[in-house]
């Protein structure tokens, strides 16, 4: 006769919803960051030509910016969750709309203004890269602060980087095979911006008890979601207009 074994897992060792939200955020941050990087490189190649040069400079600029963001993260000392939410919303808005902004700028600028377009391109890549670079160190610090009893430092780093690299792997495969063929570059960027914003909304609910000005944070999250959903529906018209001007 079989017996049912009692649950001997200590309550403090069970995975909390906040922990799941943060690890999911790492996966999404990595996936979205790579999408924005690939979309910028692909658009630059399409609009400016010389794909090797465009991808090399975009990827190099993005990684450099992530390094700056990681270094700057040490300056954030208080309200880590609130700061993470703000950064996540900025990444969602700027990164998600970056392909659309680049298409719009290229269609609006004179053909001779490639210099201005490059300034916008690398400026946006720098901003998104810095913001993404800020996120991962913040997530690690939040995990350590809230769930430090579950993790030694080596386990924390291992967990976070595992989800980071898994997110990058999924996007590296899906971007050329599924996302761009079915959604196009503009919708792909906006879709992943929505994912960033949804992670912010989830974290907003999970960490509600420790957030100041929760209603303001919720309103900002809702506004970003509304903008991105509207952009998703308008992406086809923008693509058609920009391609007619190309």
Question: What are the functions of these language-model segments?
Answer:
Residues 2-246:
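Alpha-helical transmembrane segments of multi-pass membrane proteins
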């Amino acid at each position: 006769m079989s017996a049912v074994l009692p649950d001997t897992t200590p309550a403090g060792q069970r995975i909390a919803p906040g922990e799941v939200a943060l690890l999911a955020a790492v996966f999404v941050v990595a996936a979205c960051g790579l999408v924005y990087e690939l979309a910028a490189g692909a658009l630059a190649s399409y609009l400016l030509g010389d794909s090797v040069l465009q991808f090399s400079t975009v990827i190099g600029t993005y990684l450099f910016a992530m390094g700056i963001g990681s270094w700057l993260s040490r300056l954030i000392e208080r309200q880590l969750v609130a700061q993470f939410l703000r950064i996540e919303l900025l990444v969602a808005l700027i990164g998600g709309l970056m392909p659309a902004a680049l298409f719009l700028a290229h269609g609006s600028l004179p053909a001779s203004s490639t210099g201005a377009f490059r300034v916008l391109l690398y400026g946006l890549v720098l901003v998104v890269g810095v913001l993404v670079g800020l996120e991962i160190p913040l997530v690690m610090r939040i995990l350590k602060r809230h769930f430090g009893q579950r993790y030694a430092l080596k386990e924390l780093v291992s967990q976070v980087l595992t989800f980071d690299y898994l997110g990058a792997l999924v996007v590296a495969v899906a971007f050329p095979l599924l996302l761009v063929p079915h959604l196009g570059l503009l919708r792909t960027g906006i879709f992943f911006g929505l994912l960033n914003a949804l992670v912010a909304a989830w974290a907003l609910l999970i960490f509600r008890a420790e957030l100041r000005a929760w209603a303001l944070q919720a309103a900002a999250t809702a506004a970003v979601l509304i903008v991105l959903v509207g952009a998703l529906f308008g992406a086809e018209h923008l693509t058609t207009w920009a391609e007619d001007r190309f």
